[in-house]
Amino acid sequence: MDGYEIEKIDEGLWAIDDKMGCSMYLVEGKNKALLVDTGVQEGKILPMLKSLTDKPISLALTHAHIDHMYHADEFEEVYLHERDIKAWHGGVGLCMSLAQLCFTSSIRSTGSRSIFPLLTRLSLISVASR
């Protein structure tokens, strides 16, 4: 699909690389799907993802760097660890002008939980550096 390299790893699990060399994963559960990171390829990412699943797609960001969250504004539910939310609001390590342009949706904290049960088929483990 237009610059994306998609590998189906298992039923309901895809590894996706964009043409900029960024990797992401789409995991499909019973009622919804979860994308882990978004990459930075130009254009919209949701049309490509919707060709893989018809379920609503939430986004989990591994951390607040632009190459992981560029398309976050396309998602209604975006999750990020609370420490990265603080870094995001403080501008730590970010090019804020670019980040503010591409990321306008609200983010939800995974809280201090170490296991983030979003889908029925897996648990996403939330890890933050100390």
Language-model segments: what does each one mean?
Residues 32-34, 58, 129:
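Structural motif
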Residues 4-5, 23-25, 114-116, 120-122, ...:
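Residue-level detector of beta-strand structural context in well-folded domains
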Residues 2-50:
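Conserved beta-strand hairpin/beta-sheet module of binuclear metal-dependent hydrolase folds
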Residues 41-125:
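Active-site HxH/HxHxD metal-binding segment of metal-dependent hydrolases
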Residues 1-4, 101-102, 126-130:
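Short charge-dense sequence patches
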